[in-house]
Each structure stands twice: as structure tokens, then as C-alpha cells.
């Protein structure tokens, strides 16, 4: 089974003034910000610890103010230690060095990009391609679902188990949880009955099974004992499945949404601002915020595939980090989208009048405020504002004059992938990328239907212990990229098909540059134009920029790793 490493920063609070992310390079000059996880040493890794954990930024680089999320989230928090994407050593696509791989925190960056927002667009495309679910990751998750479903079917043979959330829509990160809903007929929700059965069958880690019976939607939270995938189980909740269908519909209308959402989810995840249970903004709320942004955005081409992702990302951060009035304004996406006055709408809420920092009307149930539990919305707002300042500076015309702009990552200034996440994905590829991966015998009995859908098992008849990363550890490699796969939701038959497509999806199409890219991003000295305030304090953007021709936007097609002619290097 997979076991993540100990948090070396767990007993040391991060300094309040620590900068968020320093300029990242593909050399080992910046790999000393975090020490490697302890599990790597237990696994026999020959990589030595970096010489220092307090590296300073490049002396010539202008670094904006510290990310407010750093000072507000101490690493002693257990939730943060459980988050593979938060803290830890940054992983990346570096060069091989001795017995290991040198990481830089940006494994998606395999080449130099154009300058400015065109380069940011290219990098967002590569990030999406790298972070999108791989076939073996979907296969692993389906096996987790099958194991849990077998326990549920043993208790209630007529129960119906369905997947919803990011796993159903395909917009999940490598460490995202799985959302399951169980439909059946019970007088009282059988939370504790299922909790006892999951413990009995050893499907989950003993300490990870928790029953949140007092929550708005009562759920069971657990961590799969073999894969460390987190699972939330609810009962008789219809809206979750309907919301997944709604997300798919909007994704078809706005092809840019998956690119924005994956970047934003990673941005919040590594700052521990993504859990509604702790006041953060959940995936559904974040998606609706992105939809509202695109609906009310001044660009007419926001719904066509070749929109510049870099421009949209920066303007998203500008809107929700700088201009949006969280105190007075609510978000509504029905009927083309609009802003609403919170004090008027909340009087008609299902739960009565409740002060809500972030009001987002549920399009499936207008009387429901899906953002009412996000009491940490102001902290998210500050993080968005920070990202806006950082990215605006990085794509400005003067950024090309900074040292090391040929190798530094623009997107890596606000997000990065930890060593732990990269190695976790390698472990998944090694386990589920094989044709005959042994089914873990230590997770209790699995139903015959689940066993049929999973790969064949070669585990010894005397219950050989499950293999762990200590036994299966391979050198981290992020060279092969697989595009996002749409999760099969009706059955797990698609799991077997994913294996045959694993090698065919690794090639990329050629990337084309467009003229006029220098005009894509408005000068930071002038600021973003065309914003007015409504009577309710919300940001309403005018149509000044709708007239821009589509050829001003970078054509967002996939690319090969190598280009025929060298282009301008990535700016800071």
C-alpha cells in the first residue's frame, strides 16, 4: 500500500513573512526550499537532503508581498500535513543528477515558452496536460470504488452506488477525493452501520474513518488503506449527480473551463483553502465562480477553444481578488448569469436569513447558497489578489530584462507540484500501468463483480502482504503525458479500455504562434480597463474589448515538445 512520508515541516511554523513561491528554475539552484519526505529515505533513496531550507530569492528579481495564505496556515495543522500537495519538497521536470532526479516544482515545464501572456497560455496548456487524469489513475480509483461498493452491496444488495463530483466530471487532481452517494430506503441514515462494516473489512485506515452526522449533508469520510485515496460517502443526495451533469454541460459551452479549473484547484489545494469543512471554497463553488466570470466577461470569444488562457486566468484573479464585493454581491449563473444583492436574496433562502460571506446561488436549487460554509472567503480573496499581482508582473514587458528569464516559470510563481505528489503518481503508474497488477489482499473481500472489473490478481494464495512504495519505488519520471480522460460513470467497463489507450495519448499536436501577441495583455501601468461598479457594489465589466479580432488571441492547440525554430524565452 502507498504510505506518504512524514512532514518534516510539521513541527515548525512557517514564518509570517515568508514569500509564497520563489522564482523557479530547471536547475538545482532552487531545490533547497524544502527537504525531501522521510519516506524517501525509508525507501532507500540515495538522494541527500538539500544543504539549506532557507534560500533567498534572486537578488535582481522584484518579488511582491508575501502570500497571505502562508501566514494563516501553520504547518502544524494536521490537515495540512495530510495534504500531499501542500508543503513538502517541490517536484519538477528537472534533469537527472546521479542516482535521482533534480526537481524544480514545475514538472509540466519541459521547454521554453514565448514571452508574456502567450507564454503563460502555453504553460497553462502544458500544466493541464500534465495534471489531467491518467488512465491508470482512473483505473486505480475505480478499484477503490469497487471495494467500497462490495461492502455496501453486502449490507444492502438493492442499494445503488453512484459517483459524482470531480471524479465523474474528470476535473480532478491526482490527490482529489472521490465522492460517492448511496441510494436506498432507510428510515434513518445508516451512517454508523456502514462505518462499522468498512472498519470490519479493513477497506479504510482505522483512524481515517469519520462520521460527520451533524454536517449539513451527513457523510462518512475515509482514506482507502491501499491507495490513500480519500472518499466521501453520502446517502440519498440527488443534487450531487445532477451537479456533475451541469458541470459537463458548461464545460462543453466553455472549452476554457477545464484549464482554468485545474489551475485554480491546484492553487487553492496547496494553500489548504479548498475544503468547505474548514471554511475554504469547494470545487463546486469554484466552478460556479469560473462560470460566472466567463458569462459576464467582456470577451466575445470566451467560449471558443483558442482563447488565451493566460489572459483569462489573470483577469479571474483580478476580479475575485480585487474588485468583487463579497459583502454585498452574490453570484447567479442561471439565465446567462448576473450579480444579485445579497441582502435581498438571502431573505428567501431555504434556511432563512443567514449571513454568508460568499453567496453563490445553486442553479439546481435556487434557494440553496452553496457558498454559505466558505467562511474563509476573505483569505481566498487575498490569495487571489496576490496571484494577480504576481502574474501581472511576470507577463509585463519589463520582465524580459530580468536575469534567468530563459528558464524560469511564470505559472510556477503561484503553483507548484510537490515531490510527494510526483512520486505518488509514479507509484500509481507502476502499479496500475501493468497489465496484471495484483489486487491488494489486505483490503478485505471484494465482490465477484468488482473482481471481474479489476485487473487479474497474482497474489499468493496465502495472502501475501500488499506491496508498498518501499518495494516498488522507481525513479520519478514525468516525461510521459496523457491527456484528460472523461470518466466512465455508468460502469467500470471503461477502465479496461484505458489501458490500451495509455500509449496512444502521449503525443501532442504542433503549437502555432499568432501575430499581435504583445497586445494581448493590457499594460499594467494603465490597469485593466472597462470596469464599473453596480449599485450593489459588484464588478460589472463593459464591452470595450469585444471588438478585438480573434487572431489577437493565441491559438490554444496542443504542441510537440520540440519546436522547429527557437522562440523567445519565457519571461519572468
UniProtKB/Swiss-Prot annotation:
Positions of region (Disordered): 1-105, 435-572
Residues bearing the modification Phosphoserine: 484
Keywords: ATP-binding, Cell cycle, Cell division, Cytoplasm, Isopeptide bond, Magnesium, Manganese, Metal-binding, Mitosis, mRNA processing, Nucleotide-binding, Nucleotidyltransferase, Nucleus, Phosphoprotein, RNA-binding, rRNA processing, Transferase, Ubl conjugation
Biased composition (Polar residues): 25-34, 477-494, 522-553
Enzyme class, spelled out: transferase
The keyword NADP is assigned to this record: no
Residue positions binding Mg(2+): 177, 179
Listed Gly residues bias regions: 89-102
Quaternary data: Component of a nucleolar TRAMP-like complex, an ATP-dependent exosome regulatory complex consisting of a helicase (MTREX), an oligadenylate polymerase (TENT4B or TENT4A), and a substrate specific RNA-binding factor (ZCCHC7 or ZCCHC8). Several TRAMP-like complexes exist with specific compositions and are associated with nuclear, or nucleolar RNA exosomes. Interacts with CPEB1; the interaction is required for TENT4B-mediated translational control.
Function: Terminal nucleotidyltransferase that catalyzes preferentially the transfer of ATP and GTP on RNA 3' poly(A) tail creating a heterogeneous 3' poly(A) tail leading to mRNAs stabilization by protecting mRNAs from active deadenylation. Also functions as a catalytic subunit of a TRAMP-like complex which has a poly(A) RNA polymerase activity and is involved in a post-transcriptional quality control mechanism. Polyadenylation with short oligo(A) tails is required for the degradative activity of the exosome on several of its nuclear RNA substrates.
Name listed for the protein in its UniProt record: Terminal nucleotidyltransferase 4B
Record organism: Homo sapiens (Human)
Amino acid at each position: 500500500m502507498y504510505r506518504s512520508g512524514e512532514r518534516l515541516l510539521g513541527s515548525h511554523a512557517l514564518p509570517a513573512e515568508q514569500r509564497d513561491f520563489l522564482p523557479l528554475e530547471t536547475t538545482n539552484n532552487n531545490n533547497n526550499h524544502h527537504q525531501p519526505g522521510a519516506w524517501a529515505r525509508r525507501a532507500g533513496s540515495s538522494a541527500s537532503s538539500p544543504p539549506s531550507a532557507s534560500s533567498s530569492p534572486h537578488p535582481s528579481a522584484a518579488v511582491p508581498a508575501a502570500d497571505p495564505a502562508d501566514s494563516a496556515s501553520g504547518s502544524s495543522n494536521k490537515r495540512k500535513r495530510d495534504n500531499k500537495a501542500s508543503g513538502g519538497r517541490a517536484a519538477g521536470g528537472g534533469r537527472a543528477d546521479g542516482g535521482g532526479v533534480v526537481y524544480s516544482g514545475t514538472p509540466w515545464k519541459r521547454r521554453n515558452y514565448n514571452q508574456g501572456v502567450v507564454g503563460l497560455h502555453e504553460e497553462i496548456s502544458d500544466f493541464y496536460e500534465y495534471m489531467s487524469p491518467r488512465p491508470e489513475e482512473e483505473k486505480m480509483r475505480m478499484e477503490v470504488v469497487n471495494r467500497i461498493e462490495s461492502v455496501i452491496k453486502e449490507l444492502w444488495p438493492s442499494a445503488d452506488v453512484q459517483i459524482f463530483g470531480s471524479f465523474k466530471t474528470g476535473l480532478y487532481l491526482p490527490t482529489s477525493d472521490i465522492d460517492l452517494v448511496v441510494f436506498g430506503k432507510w428510515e434513518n441514515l445508516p451512517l454508523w452501520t456502514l462505518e462499522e462494516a468498512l472498519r470490519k473489512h479493513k477497506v479504510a485506515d482505522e483512524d481515517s474513518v469519520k462520521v460527520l452526522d451533524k454536517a449539513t449533508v451527513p457523510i462518512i469520510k475515509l482514506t482507502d488503506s491501499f491507495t490513500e485515496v480519500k472518499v466521501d460517502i453520502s446517502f440519498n443526495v440527488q443534487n450531487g449527480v445532477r451537479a456533475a451533469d451541469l458541470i459537463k454541460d458548461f464545460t462543453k459551452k466553455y472549452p476554457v473551463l477545464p484549464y482554468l479549473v485545474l489551475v485554480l484547484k491546484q492553487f487553492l489545494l496547496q494553500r489548504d483553502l479548498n475544503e468547505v469543512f474548514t471554511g475554504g471554497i469547494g470545487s463546486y463553488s469554484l466552478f460556479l465562480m469560473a462560470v460566472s466570470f466567463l458569462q459576464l466577461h467582456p470577451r466575445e470569444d470566451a467560449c471558443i477553444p483558442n482563447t488565451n488562457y493566460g489572459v483569462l486566468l489573470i483577469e479571474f484573479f483580478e476580479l475575485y481578488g480585487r474588485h468583487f464585493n463579497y459583502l454585498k454581491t452574490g453570484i447567479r449563473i442561471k439565465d446567462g448569469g448576473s450579480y444579485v444583492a445579497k441582502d435581498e436574496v438571502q431573505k428567501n433562502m431555504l434556511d432563512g436569513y443567514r449571513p454568508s460571506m460568499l453567496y453563490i446561488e445553486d442553479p439546481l436549487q435556487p434557494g440553496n447558497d452553496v457558498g454559505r460554509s466558505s467562511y474563509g472567503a476573505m483569505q481566498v480573496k487575498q490569495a487571489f489578489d496576490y496571484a494577480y499581482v504576481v502574474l501581472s508582473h511576470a507577463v509585463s514587458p519589463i520582465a524580459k530584462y530580468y536575469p534567468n528569464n530563459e528558464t524560469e516559470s511564470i505559472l510556477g510563481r503561484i503553483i507548484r507540484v510537490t515531490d510527494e505528489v510526483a512520486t505518488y503518481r509514479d507509484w500509481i503508474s507502476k502499479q496500475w500501468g501493468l497489465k496484471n497488477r495484483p489486487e491488494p489482499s489486505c483490503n478485505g473481500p471484494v465482490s465477484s463483480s468488482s473482481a471481474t472489473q479489476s485487473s487479474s490478481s497474482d497474489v499468493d494464495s496465502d495472502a501475501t502482504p500488499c506491496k508498498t512504495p518501499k518495494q516498488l519505488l522507481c525513479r520519478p519520471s514525468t516525461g510521459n503525458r496523457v491527456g484528460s480522460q472523461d470518466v466512465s460513470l455508468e460502469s467500470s467497463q471503461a477502465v479496461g479500455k484505458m489501458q490500451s489507450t495509455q500509449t496512444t495519448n502521449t503525443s501532442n499536436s504542433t503549437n502555432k504562434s499568432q501575430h499581435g501577441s504583445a497586445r494581448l495583455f493590457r499594460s499594467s501601468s494603465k490597469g485593466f480597463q472597462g470596469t464599473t461598479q453596480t449599485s450593489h457594489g459588484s464588478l460589472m465589466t463593459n464591452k470595450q474589448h469585444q471588438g478585438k479580432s480573434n487572431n489577437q488571441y493565441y491559438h490554444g492547440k496542443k504542441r510537440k515538445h520540440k519546436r522547429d525554430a527557437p522562440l523567445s524565452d519565457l519571461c519572468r
